[in-house]
């Protein structure tokens, strides 16, 4: 599917509903500029999402099954897995064996990290897999406001939204 079209599908009533993808995008940019980047805003987002999110690292599951302490915090494991994905994507590109999952309306369900990397590398096309559901996660700017992100983080996020809108030629028309 065309990347810009897929991104446009993430606007619901003129509001970008997958700001979590932009936090990942911002983190990719910062990390590739400086390998010592601390992933602060990303870690905060992951911490605040973890109880809503069904995702639990395989490492954590294995540790729990073996009645051992997990090999690091959820946030540390999220960053480690993210760095591995960034490296793999940089080296090999998008692995089409792992398409981005979306609902029947084209709303992102699973694959926000891969979508952020696709946006970073400005791919023309991305592989998607449609799932027969209308369910959609909601991570609009309101979610970040309601979860107490700092003014500095909100400035970063709003700037990334503006850059994204420019990239897809979004002009606040009714979507």
Where does each model-flagged region fall?
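A sequence-level detector for short glycine-anchored, His/Arg-bearing signature motifs
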Residues: 105-121
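Short hydrophobic alpha-helical runs that function as membrane-insertion/retention elements
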Residues: 126-130
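Residue-level "edge-of-site" marker
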Residues: 102, 131-132
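Amphipathic, charge-rich alpha-helical segments that serve as recognition/docking helices
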Residues: 134-175
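Glycine-rich short-loop/terminal segments
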Residues: 1-74, 174-175
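Short alpha-helix boundary/capping and kink motifs at helix termini
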Residues: 51-109
């Amino acid at each position: 599917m065309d990347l810009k079209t897929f991104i446009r599908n993430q606007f619901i009533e003129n509001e970008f509903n997958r700001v979590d993808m932009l936090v990942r995008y911002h983190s990719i940019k910062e990390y590739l500029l400086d390998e010592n980047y601390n992933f602060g805003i990303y870690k905060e987002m992951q911490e605040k999402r973890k109880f809503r999110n069904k995702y639990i690292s395989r490492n954590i599951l294995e540790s729990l099954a073996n009645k051992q302490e997990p090999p690091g915090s959820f946030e540390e494991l999220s960053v480690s897995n993210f760095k591995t994905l960034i490296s793999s994507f940089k080296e090999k590109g998008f692995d089409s064996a792992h398409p981005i999952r979306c609902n029947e309306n084209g709303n992102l369900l699973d694959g926000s990290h891969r979508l952020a990397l696709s946006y970073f590398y400005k791919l023309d096309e991305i592989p998607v897999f449609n799932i027969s559901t209308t369910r959609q996660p909601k991570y609009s700017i309101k979610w970040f406001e309601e979860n107490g992100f700092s003014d500095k983080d909100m400035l970063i996020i709003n700037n990334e939204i503006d850059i994204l809108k420019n990239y897809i030629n979004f002009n606040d028309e009714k979507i």
